[in-house]
Amino acid sequence: MTLPAFKAYDIRGRVPDELNEDLARRIGVALAAQLDQGPVVLGHDVRLASPALQEALSAGLRASGREVIDIGLCGTEEVYFQTDHLKAAGGVMVTASHNPMDYNGMKLVREQARPISSDTGLFAIRDTVAADTAAAGEPTAAEHSRTDKTAYLEHLLSYVDRSTLKPLKLVVNAGNGGAGLIVDLLAPHLPFEFVRVFHEPDGNFPNGIPNPLLPENRDATAKAVKEHGADFGIAWDGDFDRCFFFDHTGRFIEGYYLVGLLAQAILAKQPGGKVVHDPRLTWNTVEMVEDAGGIPVLCKSGHAFIKEKMRSENAVYGGEMSAHHYFREFAYADSGMIPWLLIAELVSQSGRSLADLVEARMQKFPCSGEINFKVDDAKAAVARVMAHYGDQSPELDYTDGISADFGQWRFNLRSSNTEPLLRLNVETRGDAALLETRTQEISNLLRG
């Protein structure tokens, strides 16, 4: 039995061909064997197939004697939070996040919301399922419904001093995913006026798959910000583990510039802390962390690597340019809710707009944003780039792919962990023309 839905970090595949209720039940049995003793937290996103997949997963776990805590429709971060908060043995979020309509998936964690990835149990689960030894009898253990979100909401609100918050007007675009439910629960505790876009959870995704990284999905948020004169806008993906920002002009803010901003917000509350960041774009983050008295720590991109590094370094915050933001007190997990609360606090306390907070940083360290290339031979494409620049003797780093630092500009080139792509990021020290030249130059080399 081949199981293509098992990826390096999670399970993702087409329903029902690559992921279905029979497989979900078997995954439940196999997962039970991987976890320490204790209950397992389960939750699901808005996709139409998600409740049935969760039910089958639960049946497999309970047939293996595992108590299940069902937290129902939620965001991925809620499974992380409740797994840690309830001291459960593990947790599973049934979600395909921003994948196409016919997909579904699972994100798995063990105790303390520690990720279960390929080399920490996920492929062992796959092999058990594939060997067909994960058959299960009737469920014997209990399932409890726990939909009370009070502890989670209180934790989110603990990141900001509500007495300093101004009555900002915020556009919130849940993309018909799950974020709107949490915004509505937070709203009574905050002085903000919310303009709600695509707010109702709807697994049919009538307004398209919620993936704000796609330029065509940004228009609705940008337009609403401008039409309503909002202070800024926030858009989430389907399971709201990532959030994306738009300034008061409707301009999309690259996730890179949010990392430094959020680092400063956290370091103001936890001085001298370590901040973990990825190698794709670094100069702005390193400077802002050091200016705030923090210690930057470089780490390979990907949530499993970032979380592991944060734990080993006791880092207060971790940020990736891909809009994943991790917080120590949040079980070292990523949250799509904490960042916008911190940015709203920053805007309130500083009296400056989001645009103003990032503009100087964008000028000082302009970046290309991530550019993807489909290439037939990735090694040959990378070799062409390195041969072209080899005589310039760049400082090289291999933390994640290849990072080459030329003093006034740098690039990072890496293979995707999940797709057959090369990903390029370029940044310069305040030179937009050089950025354009080098980005075009490398793009041509990669295309051969």
Curated annotation (Swiss-Prot):
Keywords annotated in UniProt: Exopolysaccharide synthesis, Isomerase, Lipopolysaccharide biosynthesis, Magnesium, Metal-binding, Phosphoprotein
Q: Kindly list the cofactors needed.
A: Mg(2+)
User: Which SUPFAM superfamilies does the record associate with it?
Assistant: Phosphoglucomutase, C-terminal domain, Phosphoglucomutase, first 3 domains
Is Phosphoprotein one of the keywords UniProt gives this record?
yes
Instruction: Explain how, and how many, cofactor molecules are bound.
Output: Binds 1 Mg(2+) ion per subunit.
GO terms in the biological process aspect are: GDP-mannose biosynthetic process; lipopolysaccharide biosynthetic process
InterPro entries linked: A-D-PHexomutase_a/b/a-I, A-D-PHexomutase_a/b/a-I/II/III, A-D-PHexomutase_a/b/a-II, A-D-PHexomutase_a/b/a-III, A-D-PHexomutase_C, A-D-PHexomutase_C_sf, A-D-PHexomutase_CS, Alpha-D-phosphohexomutase_SF
Enumerate the residues binding Mg(2+): S97, D237, D239, D241
Q: Which reaction does it catalyse?
A: alpha-D-glucose 1-phosphate = alpha-D-glucose 6-phosphate; alpha-D-mannose 1-phosphate = D-mannose 6-phosphate
Name of the molecule in the record: Phosphohexose mutases
